[in-house]
């Protein structure tokens, strides 16, 4: 899953995974934002699997696009 990262005007970083609607997280550093969104996505995928929902096929867990 691709992680898109961008620095906001206020200095915070936002990381988003477009393949999973609503998966975005802010951090005070680029590394923090990426770590937060990765944790969020893993929890969301685990939740889908636990509830018998179809999860997207994942060949590589994360790829960061600057």
Set out the residue ranges of the language-model regions.
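Short, charged, surface-exposed hinge/linker loops at domain edges
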Residues: 1-2, 31, 35-66
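Short aromatic-glycine-(Arg/Gly/Cys) micro-motifs in beta-strand/loop hairpins
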Residues: 5-20
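A short, exposed loop/beta-hairpin motif centered on an aromatic-Gly-Thr core
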Residues: 21-31
């Amino acid at each position: 899953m691709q992680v898109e990262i961008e620095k906001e005007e206020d200095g915070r970083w936002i990381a988003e995974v477009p393949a999973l609607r609503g998966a975005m997280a802010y951090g005070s550093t680029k590394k923090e934002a990426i770590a937060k969104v990765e944790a969020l996505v893993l929890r969301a995928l685990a939740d889908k699997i636990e509830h018998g929902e179809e999860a997207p096929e994942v060949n590589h867990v994360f790829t960061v696009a600057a």
